[in-house]
Curated annotation (Swiss-Prot):
It comes from Pseudomonas putida (strain ATCC 47054 / DSM 6125 / CFBP 8728 / NCIMB 11950 / KT2440). It is found in: Cytoplasm. Keywords: Amino-acid biosynthesis, Arginine biosynthesis, Cytoplasm, Transferase. The gene is argF. Pathway: Amino-acid biosynthesis; L-arginine biosynthesis; L-arginine from L-ornithine and carbamoyl phosphate: step 1/3. This is Ornithine carbamoyltransferase. Belongs to the aspartate/ornithine carbamoyltransferase superfamily. OTCase family. The keyword Cytoplasm applies.
Amino acid sequence: MSARHFLSLLDFTTDELLGVIRHGIELKDLRKRGVLFEPLKNRVLGMIFEKSSTRTRVSFEAGMIQLGGQAIFLSPRDTQLGRGEPIGDSAIVLSSMVDVVMIRTHAHSTLTEFAAKSRVPVINGLSDESHPCQLLADMQTFVEHRGSIQGKTVTWIGDGFNMCNSYIEAARQFDFQLRIACPEGYEPDQRFMALGGDRVQIIRDAREAVRDAHLVVTDVWTSMGQEEETARRLAHFAPYQVTRELLDLAAPDVLFMHCLPAHRGEEISQDLLDDPRSVAWDEAENRLHAQKALLEFLVEPAYHHA
């Protein structure tokens, strides 16, 4: 049996995604009650980082330990990935020593090349194309607070980059309407827009985009690797700051999410994370629980069919 990978939300069926989310909620409850649950005892997660991280590293490392396993952190200084050794060769060797691999990288092609040669599951911890693990946490957070997201309206405000791409995939997989509010020149790649079909639309006016929305989401205006564009981006995105007043135009039960870290005074107002409609802290914690469910889903079948 070949290994299952999680490089994008499209790698799982809708039922599988919903099952992972439900199990993430169960694992969260077990942890809060102090119940020991170690289905991945003696399993090892290899974590390859080409980009710095706080939430991704801590959530995966802590999650694997809580499931009874262990995690190995590999920084660019620790590996030959893409430096002298072909990615496929690294995948063959590393996947013979660990039970699952998580990669946080720049080029999405690194993930696909690694997965093609890996004998164990590979997880996308973030690439320049998508961030599916964050979407698992976001969808779990919405389900916990509001129930099913099917048929709801979600507004993405900001850059049409990797997080936005994953929201387009989520609109397809979870069947919700997605409005994208962004300046001209910052739209998502046409491949993703085509994927979203009639579930996705671009609206230039942020106020119009949030009207009656059930979920409003944003992210930083300048991602890692784009620092030289900061001044230009600040000018272009200024009309897209999410404030309490903007949320007032959304549905009465609207939720606000941000994958963090947040730049207060830029993409959000200084006080927005303190607004009762913000669930950003729950969202951040749910990275731990959703990814534990994902690890169990991927590693246990791979182990039993080995």
